[in-house]
């Protein structure tokens, strides 16, 4: 999901918490999530001031902010360099193992497959096989 262009990275994450009716400290949770994805120093930047990879990480922070039980992620590491992609993979793995979050994702990144419990290969819009 695209970021709201007239809101800072911080505001993009905090807005979702307001919409979800988050009962905790929204400021603290917003800052935690942005720091978790390595953007603590960029939280007051507008989306157009962020690289594609940084924007992707803001979207991930926004997705995890309200502590969902399930996350749908379409190519979550697509615009990230390999080191940042590994960082995102670690975050997802921790969410799965420590918080019991289910993550359903599409990806071409075979590295992400190592955290998967179930893998479906799709060819021409059809499930070709299951691992």
Residue spans of the language-model regions?
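Catalytic Walker B motif of ABC-type/P-loop ATPase nucleotide-binding domains
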Residues: 71-74
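Conserved catalytic motifs of ABC-family nucleotide-binding domains
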Residues: 67
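ABC nucleotide-binding domain "signature" region
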Residues: 25-37
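Hydrophobic anchor residue at the start of the ABC signature
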Residues: 60
């Amino acid at each position: 999901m695209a970021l709201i262009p007239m809101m800072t990275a911080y505001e993009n994450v905090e807005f979702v918490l307001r919409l979800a009716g988050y009962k905790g400290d929204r400021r603290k949770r917003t800052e935690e999530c942005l720091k978790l994805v390595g953007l603590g120093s960029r939280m007051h930047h507008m989306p157009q001031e962020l690289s594609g990879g940084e924007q992707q990480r803001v979207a991930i922070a926004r997705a995890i902010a309200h502590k969902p039980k399930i996350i749908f992620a379409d190519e979550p590491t697509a615009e990230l360099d390999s080191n940042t992609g590994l960082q995102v993979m670690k975050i997802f793995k921790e969410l799965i193992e420590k918080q019991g979050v289910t993550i359903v994702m599409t990806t071409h990144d075979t590295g992400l497959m190592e955290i998967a419990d179930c893998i479906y290969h799709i060819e021409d819009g059809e499930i070709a096989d299951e691992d």
